[in-house]
């Protein structure tokens, strides 16, 4: 496990399934009170086509609920398509030995899946959301809508959950602000709160620092460290600094394939990152965060 090679198939680490390895690590860290982790994602021999082009090839990936994982790779490597395959926005090509299970199921209604998996896109909100108050934008997460339409029935519990999610993101002060008047960093906090209203066991973050200035990036990363105490983090990024100290596993992608999957300390090296991004990389680590130049 953790070897970069041309075939695109990551070697498997000894010691059982990924879920079993995570349980072993939790026990070694002294966590014996938490309930056993459940399987979240299982992919075997997954190919995904967009139009006539196959953009994901032979993907093998297993993630346990509550696990913290970073998917790292250059732009155009297939990360966005992998997200769509995980969130059931697109489905794999059916073939021999192919398997794609989310919580043990092949197919999901997207609104039902959002109760278990919170998804935060790299893009800022669509045209309707900027004319929505912060609290209403968060509540709209219950309906997977761009805003709160008049026909939607909002309960007191939904409002309570929305306030709770804003508080988790240290964004309660944004409840009465128009989303369109917020900074990029403030908007990202509201959108993550929107994904948290269901109290999902897993949170998928696509390029979380996209469009944020340095101060907003730092604030968001520290807030997400708190979220990581109660939910698994699946982070898709090409920025090393996005990888929180709580994330111990890294999956590397290149040219539509997983080329390495292993412990963060084994994969975040200058040699491996230089191979992955095709450019000479110099690394430094500070307070659990890695930076490159």
Task: Label the predicted regions.
Residues 87:
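Helix-to-loop junction immediately C-terminal to a conserved catalytic motif
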Residues 271-293:
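ABC ATPase nucleotide-binding domains
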Residues 197-201:
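A short, proline-enriched helix->beta-strand linker immediately N-terminal to the Walker B motif
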Residues 139, 154-174:
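Conserved ABC ATPase "signature" region
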């Amino acid at each position: 496990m953790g070897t970069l090679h041309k075939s695109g198939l990551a070697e498997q680490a000894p010691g059982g399934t990924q879920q079993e390895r995570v349980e072993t690590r939790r026990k070694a860290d002294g966590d014996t009170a938490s309930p056993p982790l459940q399987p979240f994602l299982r992919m075997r021999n997954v190919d995904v086509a967009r139009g006539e082009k196959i953009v994901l090839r032979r993907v093998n990936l297993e993630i346990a609920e509550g696990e913290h994982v970073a998917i790292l790779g250059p732009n155009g490597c297939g990360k966005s398509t992998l997200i769509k395959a995980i969130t059931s926005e697109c489905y794999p090509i059916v073939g021999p030995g192919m398997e794609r299970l989310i919580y043990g199921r092949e197919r999901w209604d997207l609104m039902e899946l959002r109760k278990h998996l919170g998804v935060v896109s790299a893009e800022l909100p669509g045209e309707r959301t900027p004319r929505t108050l912060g609290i209403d934008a968060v509540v709209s997460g219950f309906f997977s809508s761009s805003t709160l339409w008049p026909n939607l029935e909002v309960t007191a519990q939904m409002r309570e959950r929305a306030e709770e999610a804003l508080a988790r993101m240290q964004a309660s002060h944004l409840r009465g602000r128009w989303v369109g008047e917020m900074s990029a960093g403030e908007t990202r906090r509201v959108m993550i709160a929107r994904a948290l209203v269901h109290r999902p066991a897993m949170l998928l973050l696509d390029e979380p620092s996209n469009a944020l200035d340095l101060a907003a990036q730092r604030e968001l990363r520290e807030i997400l460290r708190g979220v990581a105490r109660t939910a698994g983090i699946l982070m898709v990024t090409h920025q090393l600094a996005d990888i929180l100290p709580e994330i111990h596993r890294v999956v590397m992608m290149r040219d539509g394939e997983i080329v390495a999957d292993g412990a963060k300390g084994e994969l975040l090296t200058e040699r491996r990152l230089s191979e992955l991004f095709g450019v000479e990389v110099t690394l430094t680590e500070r307070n659990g965060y890695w930076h490159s130049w």
